[in-house]
């Protein structure tokens, strides 16, 4: 799938094609108008292969070969020993258009990648480097998978040295626009606001967040819970189908969302067979992020959200069960029509037919979000349910979508809609 507007912005090329002539034209225009980097021009075979695979027009056996090249963008991943960083590496290992040049960590520095993430095969077994500006200098892009509050300083130092380096923050440091919201929920100094990495979010002005990611150099990857709730509710609020002041979301979430650090309540003997609510009463840090997204999607203030996550004994996954009052006469068909209007053309979002609802098992390992909806006429409530893999579509997959857009690559390169089962 070649979305030429991502490379050039030329309206006459704003179509899908796997034609090599069209790809050449895209890159030629990008080179002339936007001064495309040399690696982009040199990687036509890689990108054409990715476009064909992503559009379903070719099989791996017929796609153009990668070939030998040293011109692929060089990527550094920081926080590789954690779940988010490890999942990012897993996806990048299958990306045909980039090179994982450096893998860094903090407490695990000095170990081989195979010691902390034996499931990841990069074709070699790198030693995890120390996390420092010196280590990260000289890359085309840096992915920061660090705990909240730890990305701001190193990101600022990297950008000060090289304004052209692309930095993606998988933590929360650069998601919120409001310094007051940041202070209320994170109790530290606000590091500023970066371009938000949720390509599918349709904004109040009719554009998508995707447009802002093309060529971006500072990207804040969304929170996993925020993605599940925001993409479920935004189309329905924009269509005026829900009571915006009485929104509720209850989210069974997998334990990987709590991170990899050893904690008593995350031990198998504590967690197995038990469901545990946490951050009850509006204290979860994704609440202001969801409300920010809903404001941007509708162009209106005043949304109120009761948000309750619940840890359940599964490794990965989020099932966001969202409810809100609806006006009498609003039907399930109305909800599904609004969702389809927003997402019918979105590669990684599936709106399910009436009477069908998603499960976390259907999205495990895939960069997909599945949504079902229904109206309960007896209670006057709408129920909208979305499911995603918190480590893929909720984190690393969203990062890779944004990385592709920022680098001028087809958005779906290196990502799959196919989940693991059972």
Segments (PLM) and residue ranges:
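Short, low-complexity intrinsically disordered segments enriched in A/P/G/S/L with frequent Arg
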Residues: 4, 14, 34-35
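Conserved active-site and cofactor/substrate-binding residues in soluble primary-metabolism enzymes
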Residues: 83, 193, 224-231, 281-289, ...
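Oxyanion-binding "anion nests"
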Residues: 284-307, 311-315
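C-terminal active-site/capping subdomain that shapes the small-molecule cofactor and substrate pocket
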Residues: 320-422
């Amino acid at each position: 799938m070649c979305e030429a507007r991502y490379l050039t912005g030329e309206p006459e090329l704003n179509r899908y094609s796997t034609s090599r002539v069209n790809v050449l034209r895209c890159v030629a225009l990008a080179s002339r108008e936007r001064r495309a980097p040399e690696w982009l021009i040199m990687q036509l075979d890689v990108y054409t292969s990715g476009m064909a695979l992503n559009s379903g027009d070719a099989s791996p056996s017929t796609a153009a070969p990668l070939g030998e090249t040293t011109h692929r963008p060089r990527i550094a991943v920081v926080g590789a020993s954690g779940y988010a960083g490890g999942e990012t590496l897993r996806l990048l290992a299958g990306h045909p258009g980039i090179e994982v040049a450096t893998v860094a960590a903090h407490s695990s520095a000095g170990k081989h990648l195979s010691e902390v993430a034996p499931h990841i095969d990069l074709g070699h077994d790198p030693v995890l480097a120390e996390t420092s500006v010196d280590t990260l200098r000289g890359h085309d892009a840096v992915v920061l998978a660090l705990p909240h509050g730890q990305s701001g300083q190193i990101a600022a130092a990297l950008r000060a040295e090289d304004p052209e380096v692309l930095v993606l923050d998988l933590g929360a440091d650069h998601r919120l626009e409001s310094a007051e919201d940041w202070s209320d929920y994170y109790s530290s100094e606000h590091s500023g606001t970066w371009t938000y990495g949720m390509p599918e979010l349709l904004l109040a002005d009719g554009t998508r967040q995707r447009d802002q990611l093309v060529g971006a150099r500072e990207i804040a990857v969304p929170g996993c819970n925020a993605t599940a709730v925001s993409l479920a509710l935004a189309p329905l609020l924009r269509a005026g189908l829900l009571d915006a002041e009485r929104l509720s979301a209850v989210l069974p979430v997998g334990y990987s969302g709590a991170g990899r650090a050893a904690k008593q309540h995350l031990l198998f003997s504590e967690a197995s067979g038990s469901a545990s609510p946490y951050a009850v009463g509006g204290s979860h840090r994704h609440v202001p992020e969801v409300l920010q997204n809903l404001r941007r999607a509708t162009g209106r203030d005043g949304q109120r959200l009761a948000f309750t996550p619940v840890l359940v004994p599964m490794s990965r996954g989020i099932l966001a069960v969202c409810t809100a009052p609806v006006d009498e006469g609003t039907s399930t068909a109305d909800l599904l029509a609004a969702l389809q209007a927003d997402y019918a053309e979105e590669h990684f979002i599936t709106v399910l037919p009436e009477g069908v609802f998603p499960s976390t098992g259907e999205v495990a390992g895939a960069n997909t979000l599945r949504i079902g909806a229904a109206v309960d006429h007896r209670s006057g409530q709408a129920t909208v349910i979305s499911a995603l893999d918190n480590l893929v579509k909720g984190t690393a997959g969203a990062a890779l979508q944004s990385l592709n857009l920022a680098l001028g690559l087809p958005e779906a390169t290196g990502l799959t809609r196919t989940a693991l089962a059972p």
